[in-house]
């Protein structure tokens, strides 16, 4: 379903696109030719723009959202896998974002990249063209003192 938010209407390039009946697209969103948005996906351009390039697809249950000053720009022929969370990032042409990945504000992913399933890219990460990225790095932020343990 396409919704208008305030004065912002969703823009489409041509008539050749698909939005599943229970997908939600609203606000400052531009869909290129041959874009598809699948079941349960939410594309919410409420405070900044979201541009999805020609031939790209947003798979089931993915969420695209923005912050002021952090738009989402998705290049051409990009696949955003099932249950992906994109927030204020840029994705280059011919890239694939794997199932259940989380891409945070101001991340820049180059052209021809593969982001593996369940990958977390933290704010401001830059991924060069032709890269394969998988997993998420965690580290200890705080350790309890011996006397604090039960």
Describe each region flagged by the PLM.
Residues 1-15:
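Extreme N-terminal tail/first-helix region
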Residues 9-11, 137, 144:
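Proline-rich low-complexity regions
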Residues 5, 19-20, 140:
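Intrinsically disordered, low-complexity regions enriched in small/polar residues
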Residues 69, 138:
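Residues that form or immediately flank small-molecule/cofactor binding pockets and catalytic motifs
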Residues 15, 20-21, 26-27, 32-33, ...:
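Left-handed beta-helix
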């Amino acid at each position: 379903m396409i919704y208008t938010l305030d004065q912002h209407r969703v823009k489409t390039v041509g008539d050749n696109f698909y939005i599943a009946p229970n997908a939600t697209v609203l606000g400052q969103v531009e869909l290129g030719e041959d874009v598809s948005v699948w079941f349960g996906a939410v594309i919410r351009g409420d405070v900044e723009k979201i541009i999805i390039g020609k031939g790209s697809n947003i798979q089931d249950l993915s969420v695209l959202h923005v912050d002021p000053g952090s738009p989402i720009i998705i290049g051409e022929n990009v696949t955003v896998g099932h249950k992906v969370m994109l927030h204020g990032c840029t994705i280059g042409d011919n890239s694939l974002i794997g199932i259940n990945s989380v891409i945070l504000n101001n991340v820049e992913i180059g052209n021809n990249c593969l982001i593996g399933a369940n990958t977390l890219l933290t704010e401001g990460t830059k991924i060069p063209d032709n890269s394969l990225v998988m997993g998420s790095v965690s580290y200890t932020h705080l350790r309890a003192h011996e006397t604090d343990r039960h």
